[in-house]
From Swiss-Prot:
Pfam families: DUF150_C, RimP_N. Belongs to the RimP family. This is Ribosome maturation factor RimP. The keyword Zinc does not apply. It comes from the Bacteria. It is found in: Cytoplasm. Residues 188-252 are annotated as: Disordered. Residues 208-224 have a biased composition (Basic residues). Required for maturation of 30S ribosomal subunits. The keyword Cytoplasm applies. GO terms for biological process: ribosomal small subunit assembly; translation. HAMAP family: RimP. It comes from Rhodospirillum centenum (strain ATCC 51521 / SW). GO terms for cellular component: cytosol.
Length: 252
């Protein structure tokens, strides 16, 4: 976690100066870890492969100088996608009304996992409207409904509105729903790829060191055999660098 936070501090000023915003920095893997940089455009436009490539080059240059990760690693730059993670407080306000899943570091109202509709923010806390409970057939689960968010805003007793301090949020992500797809298509003209999709650039930021390969030994020249004819002289190297077989060379 310390390495991730340090990397974020190193690259964020340059990324923002280029017209982008950091969404998430994540490090995964073992001996050769993958450093994932997730970013979006500050102007709200859709990310392109060229955007990801520009960020990748800038980040690579910074990390080569600062060297926050020992050894070899793979750098991956991607766009958030539609079913994006919610990592900043403003994300919960921006996507108010859409369905999301959320997990907390400690129990809130006796639970750690929530699924409901984002209802904005309150100071430094996230407001989440849980589904309106409706009678269902025996054995069937009640599906979330967008009415929960509307009811939560209106203070309807049927909706359960939970307020979660942002500092307790472990991870959160939008649910891929028809409403979200429609909104994304209307905003950008066409639905972009989901998280980890086409808007992604990978490169070996620090290639692994290749094992040393010993140089091939040059074959030694052989002298004339015991029974070579007089005047045969020395063997001459062949065109391929190896010794040419003379008429009096002794077979081995």
């Amino acid at each position: 976690m310390e390495a991730v936070e340090r990397i974020g501090r190193i690259i964020e000023p340059s990324v923002e100066a280029m017209g982008y915003e950091l969404v998430r920095v994540q490090l995964s893997g073992g001996q050769r870890p993958t450093l994932q940089i997730m970013a979006e455009r500050s102007d709200g436009a859709a990310m392109t492969v060229e955007d990801c490539a520009d960020i990748s080059r800038a980040v690579s240059a910074l990390l080569d100088v600062e060297d926050p990760l020992p050894g070899a690693y793979t750098l991956e730059v991607s766009s958030p996608g539609i079913d994006r993670p919610l990592t900043r407080l403003k994300d919960f306000e921006r996507f108010a009304g859409f369905e999301a899943r959320l997990e907390t570091k400690a129990p809130v109202d006796g639970r750690k996992r929530f699924r409901g509709f984002l209802a904005g923010i309150e100071d430094d806390a996230v407001r989440l409207a849980l589904p309106v409970e409706k009678k269902a057939r025996k054995g069937a689960k009640a599906a979330p409904t967008r009415d929960a968010a509307d009811a939560g805003e209106a203070g309807d007793a049927e909706a359960t509105l939970v307020v979660i301090p942002f500092g307790l949020v472990l991870k959160a992500k939008l649910e891929l729903t028809d409403e979200l797809l429609t909104a994304a298509a209307a905003e950008q003209g066409a639905a972009p790829g989901t998280e980890g999709g086409a808007m992604e650039v990978e490169e070996d930021a620090r290639p692994a060191r290749r094992p040393h390969q010993p140089k091939p030994k040059k074959a030694k020249k052989k002298g004339p055999g015991r029974f070579s004819k007089a005047g045969a002289g020395e063997d001459v190297d062949g065109a391929d660098g190896g010794p040419a077989a003379g008429p009096g060379a002794q077979d081995e």
